[in-house]
Amino acid sequence: MADRYENQPPEKLQGKYQAMVVCCILGIGSLVSWNSMLTIADYYYKVFPDYHPSRVLTLVYQPFALGTILILAYHESKINTRKRNLIGYILFTISTFLLIVLDLATKGRGGIGPYIGLCAVVASFGLADATVQGGMIGDLSLMCPELVQSFMGGLAVSGALTSALRLITKAAFEKTNDGPRKGAMMFLAISTCIELLCVFLYAYVFPKLPIVKYYRRKAASEGSKTVSADLAAAGIQNQSDLTDDDSKNQRLSNKELLIQNIDYAVNLFLIYVCTLSIFPGFLYENTGQHGLGDWYALVLVAMYNCWDLVGRYTPLVKWLKIENRKLITIAVLSRYLLIPAFYFTAKYGDQGWMIMLISVLGLTNGHLTVCIMTIAPKGYKGPEQNALGNLLVIFLLGGIFAGVALDWLWLIGKKNAF
């Protein structure tokens, strides 16, 4: 009787809203550590003024993230998703705590040694990011689109949250002795606590929600082997009978999935090439001096994060959601007009125009990302949705890596840039 009940769709999608809240928190946890690094970049610029922290740290982060997701996506169908995501969140927790230890051990002093240590911790962030993002998006892609949207929204919430906290801590500690360092340490301590919360939620709460159990059982019945440990954690055993019929459980290969969704993949790549060629390096080093002083870059980062958050929830408004594949491509390509707009605004415009441009960049980044991530998996079986989610994350991280590399081009012709 229990097994038959578990196979039925949950009444009125029971547990859906709890699952959406948990997914949002898990999304926050998958990016809060890295966003903390970006948001306290003003502190690292004071400690390491000659090493271009926002650009170098991002460039260190991305090869590890991209390399890891390539390996994990290739072996996606054989990987235990539960272990994968838990390892990722635990690695985030340890790495964020190590940033505090590193700063305390060096007493906030700069130099090449502490900077190499900082880069090593950032590399571990890259490993954790690829482990969690690919695992979570793949896992949620076999469920309802609202859960994917909530997770993607959580990524943006982490940015808005870290920006708000950074502005508060900067104001609170600005006039105190060693103020920027105290604010940064408080920041990292909060991030560590959030990561610990995510470990608990994913291990003990998320797998037991009725809607999550339903979709995972459905995926298992369609041939998915990645959800077995999650089902066991929810107290559901004896899944072998669900996956024995190989004729029903044949799935498209990764190559076939990629060919069918190549436009979505390339568009994700182009979205993040455009975004990361501007954010955050350009904002910290190429926007000049304005009335806001050293608050200027922080305000720009905060505006980007806030509008990115808004953009990830605008697809909930049905008439705003773009579902036509050609329209998505046109919207993605039109964002590249922002690059010359940023260049001329930095050179000739005032801070009001720059704030407007960064808001548009964030809004379109969030909106288009969620549109693609929620539309692409529709119509596929559970194992295919999981695989497609991982493939899309490859192109997303690839776009970030390419954008970070292109961001260095802004330094050409700038005095004392290197």
UniProtKB/Swiss-Prot annotation:
Expressed in root tips, vasculature of roots and leaves, and meristems of leaf primordia. Expressed in flowers and siliques. GO terms for biological process: nucleoside transport. It is a multi-pass membrane protein. Disruption phenotype: The isolated apoplastic sap extracted from the double mutant missing both NSH3 and ENT3 lacks the ability to catalyze the conversion of inosine in hypoxanthine; this double mutant is unable to grow on medium containing inosine as sole nitrogen source, in addition plants are more sensitive to the necrotrophic fungus Botrytis cinerea BMM but are resistant to the cytotoxic adenosine analog 2-chloro-adenosine (CADO) and to 5-fluoro-uridine. The chain crosses the membrane at residues 20-40, 56-76, 86-106, 112-132, 142-162, 186-206, 264-284, 291-311, 326-346, 353-373, 392-412. Changing G281R: In fur1; confers growth resistance to the toxic compound fluorouridine. Its main location: membrane. InterPro entries: Eqnu_transpt, MFS_trans_sf. It is found in: Cell membrane. GO terms for cellular component: plasma membrane. Induction: By nitrogen deficiency and 5-fluorouracil plus methotrexate. GO terms for molecular function: nucleoside transmembrane transporter activity. SUPFAM superfamilies: MFS general substrate transporter. Keywords: Cell membrane, Membrane, Transmembrane, Transmembrane helix, Transport. It holds the Pfam family Nucleoside_tran. Nucleoside transporter that functions as a pyrimidine nucleoside carrier in all organs. Has high affinity for adenosine and uridine when expressed in a heterologous system (yeast). Mediates proton-dependent adenosine or uridine transport in Xenopus oocytes. Belongs to the SLC29A/ENT transporter (TC 2.A.57) family. This is Equilibrative nucleotide transporter 3.
